Amino acid sequence: MGKLLAICTSPKRGTVKTEVPSAVLTPEWGIVEDAHGGNWHRQVSMLSAEKIEAFRKKIWVDYGAFGENLVIDGFDFRNLPVTSRFAIGDVVLEMTQIGKECHSDCAIRRQTGDCIMPREGVFARVVKGGTIHTGDEMKLLPTPADLPLRAAVITLSDKGSRGEREDKSGPLIVQMLTAAGYVVEETMILPDEAKALKAQLIRMADGRQVNLVLTTGGTGFSPRDITPEATCAVADRNAPGIAEAMRYHSLSITPRGMLSRGVSVLRGKTLIVNLPGSPKAVQENLEYILPSLEHGVRIAAGLDGECARK
């Protein structure tokens, strides 16, 4: 059980928020008249009161100084998994991300040289709307047993990132994942740059805590093909069987299947798999691995037991 100590809003992003006694929350939008409301995954930001109190030992800050919407006493949000649900009266919030990248013009960082929001803040979407008031109780709700697996899709393409080439592989992956029962939380097109890819893989695994990340492109022999190296750089454990199975299947179709350098790894509880860049190869590989992939994804997430056959 927690307690809502403060509600804070602002009309502009990148600024401190100011306390208000109550707020109206709208489903799939956020707090009415707050700058961060919208149809995205970071509708409401939350900070544990204990984290703010620890910061206040160095320098005094008001509630809302870190851009947080809700200050809650009694919960250490960083120790709870993404998809955790909370009730404040009739309002239901679902946690969607832990931490974030702090932009350079963050007001509190300019003033104090530090901002705890990237380390300690969490974000949520509004599942059920209503009105909340300072002093309300917050309850942690049981996690629904039938939550679908969550995925993200990253396309690697210099030309695609510049809008010079249509991305056909990314939408195909989304279509196939959706048909298999996954919820695709995010899609993006990145240039073939290791730094950008590593940052997004880390964010997807650590911040969004998706169960599966599928990349497409950048697995060949071109000097700009850096997807396997960037993927291995963020990995905790190797999961080579998936990539090996895809190469084996591709070789049954074309001898050029041996030229794929794609890898499959684990970062925390997230499985990351490199797919080829062409839509044809994407479809062939996904059709081959998807039926067996779910069990491995669920084991990595702690949702299923061992793989041993009986």
Question: Where on the chain are the PLM-derived regions?
Answer:
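Glycine-rich phosphate/diphosphate-binding loop of Rossmann-like nucleotide-binding domains
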Residues: D146-D192
